[in-house]
């Protein structure tokens, strides 16, 4: 049977991959956004696993809220990225500091 430790191990691996993705690839904004999504997915797995383990639904409801915030964050981030690419022709992180405003 799959226990709590299995879910926590998968979540720890996903969290580590997300953090490594941010630290290793600092040049591409898309990879950074995907790494942030991996981190949020790991948090959601932890919330749902502990919620099921404790028999409480609060963790699952909170995971649903985290999913909606993550979807909004991804949509806004990609929209900003598309506008930035149309204006600059590049999605390099070094060019982001040249934004006006």
From Swiss-Prot:
The way it spans or sits in the membrane comes to: Multi-pass membrane protein
* InterPro entries, per database record: NADH_UbQ_OxRdtase_chain4L/K, NUOK/Mnh_C1-like
* GO biological process annotation, one example: ATP synthesis coupled electron transport
Subunit? NDH-1 is composed of 14 different subunits. Subunits NuoA, H, J, K, L, M, N constitute the membrane sector of the complex.
Q: Write the record's keywords in alphabetical order, separated by commas.
A: Cell inner membrane, Cell membrane, Membrane, NAD, Quinone, Translocase, Transmembrane, Transmembrane helix, Transport, Ubiquinone
Q: Name one Pfam family in it.
A: Oxidored_q2
Membrane-spanning segments: 4-24, 29-49, 65-85
Q: Does the keyword Zinc apply?
A: no
Protein name (Swiss-Prot/TrEMBL)? NADH-quinone oxidoreductase subunit K
Quote the catalytic activity from the record.
a quinone + NADH + 5 H(+)(in) = a quinol + NAD(+) + 4 H(+)(out)
Give the GO molecular function terms: NADH:ubiquinone reductase (non-electrogenic) activity; quinone binding
User: Which is one Gene Ontology cellular component term of this protein?
Assistant: NADH dehydrogenase complex
Tell me which EC number(s) this protein carries. 7.1.1.-
């Amino acid at each position: 049977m799959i226990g709590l430790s299995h879910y926590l191990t998968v979540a720890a691996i996903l969290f580590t991959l997300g953090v490594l993705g941010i630290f290793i690839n600092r040049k591409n904004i898309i990879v950074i956004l995907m790494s942030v999504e991996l981190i949020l997915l790991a948090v959601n797995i932890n919330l749902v696993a502990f919620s099921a383990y404790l028999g409480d639904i609060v963790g699952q409801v909170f995971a649903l809220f985290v999913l909606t915030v993550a979807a909004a964050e991804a949509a806004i981030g990609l929209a900003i990225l598309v506008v930035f690419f149309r204006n600059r022709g590049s999605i390099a992180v070094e060019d982001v500091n040249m934004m006006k405003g």
